[in-house]
Swiss-Prot record:
Role: Catalyzes the conversion of uracil and 5-phospho-alpha-D-ribose 1-diphosphate (PRPP) to UMP and diphosphate.
Domain of life: Bacteria
Organism, scientific name: Limosilactobacillus reuteri (strain DSM 20016)
UniProt remark on cofactor binding: Binds 1 Mg(2+) ion per subunit. The magnesium is bound as Mg-PRPP.
Cystine pairs: none
UniProt record similarity statement: Belongs to the UPRTase family.
Name recorded for this polypeptide: Uracil phosphoribosyltransferase
One GO biological process term: uracil salvage
One function term, GO molecular function aspect: magnesium ion binding
């Protein structure tokens, strides 16, 4: 069973509170989402494997640690997921980037896939799927399914979001129990329009200043 973790680091919680405020502007929102994403990347990558390596410092030869195992690919769910990419690549600069495009039907609240572009070696990588919101879970599940259809394993997937609703967390964990889920905030519920309460509004609109 994959893990579900609410990242309670004080800086993450402080910055999340700031972007929940409806009065902050696009520039501040975008920059702070990037900062939160960097802090989240540190936590999401916590269990990456290490191996011993022999190096020589200016003083002596020594055995130290370096990353081992699968390299990382960051997969934002378009469009809002793009806002989390730069923060993560600040910490993992060698990560490859893939894209899965989704839009939500405002009447049915169902996601629709319109674009997929992934690295050629996607099946050989540890996947960090990113989207600021985990509401109904529909977009996350469709992204996971798109990756599985292309040969990726659930056990190599980690989903990271800024805010999650209990309904979305349950839906993803029921459907894909081996996928790890990380969120900065677990909120109360979804309203009748499918928005997370209290949430932070529409993350894509607030990131890009458009609707």
């Amino acid at each position: 069973m994959g893990k579900f973790e609410v990242l309670d680091h004080p800086l993450i919680q402080h910055k999340l509170t700031m972007i929940r405020d409806k009065n902050v502007g696009t520039k501040f929102f975008r920059e702070t989402v990037k900062e939160i994403s960097t802090l989240m990347a540190y936590e999401v990558a916590r269990d990456m494997p290490l191996k011993d390596v022999e190096i020589e410092t200016p003083i002596a030869k020594t055995t130290q640690k370096e990353l081992a195992g699968k390299k990382v690919a960051i997969i934002p769910i378009l469009r809002a997921g793009i806002g989390m990419v730069d923060g993560m690549t600040d910490l993992i600069p060698a990560a490859k980037i893939g894209f899965i495009g989704m839009y939500r039907d405002e009447e049915t609240l169902k996601p629709h896939e319109y674009f997929v572009k992934l690295p050629n070696d996607i099946t050989e990588r540890q996947l960090f799927i990113v989207d600021p919101m985990l509401a109904t879970g529909g977009s996350a599940m469709m992204a996971i399914e798109a990756l599985k259809k292309r040969g990726c394993s659930e056990k190599n997937m980690k989903f990271a979001c800024l805010v999650a609703a209990p309904e979305g967390v349950k839906a993803v964990r029921d459907a894909y129990p081996d996928v790890d889920i990380y969120t900065a905030g677990l909120d109360d519920h979804l309203n009748e329009d499918g928005y997370i309460v209290p949430g932070l509004g529409d993350a894509g609109d607030r990131l890009f200043g458009t609707k």
